[in-house]
């Protein structure tokens, strides 16, 4: 639904406009957004929801830029940030990923110890808060060197895209409310 009404494109443009056009800032935004959503929605569903948004960011890049090594590294890091952010965020709550609930059920059955939602979060959220910066450093400093400045032509492209989009339609609003 997000793709049908181009809401994913609007979200991507808004996210970049908010965070700036530096690759490392965009990676941080996608990591945090994926992790936050994944704490309350299955990590698989989160990745499926965020992937079209990340792909639309990659598609916003000028065609000539796709051939540079920096942009290829950014594109790969961006897609990995969705996957890693969703996986990391899913550890934060019982409902973030199905194995969490399975583990809680197993512990309740075998050891007669009940782990509540809040109890899980007392351990899970600090783990997420420590893991996310580590993932960010790995993606932006170790695997890919992304602080080479802003993406070429991205600021002008964002302005043009925002102007071309206009106001949100009813269908976009309905999809945004559902998600």
Regions found by a protein language model. Give the residues of each.
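Juxtamembrane and boundary regions of transmembrane helices in multi-pass small-molecule transporters
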Residues: 4-10, 43, 61-103, 109-167, ...
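Membrane-embedded alpha-helical segments and adjacent helix-loop junctions characteristic
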Residues: 1-69
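Transmembrane helical segments that form the transport core of multi-pass membrane transport proteins
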Residues: 30, 174-179
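Residues on a specific face of well-ordered alpha-helices
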Residues: 52-55, 101, 105
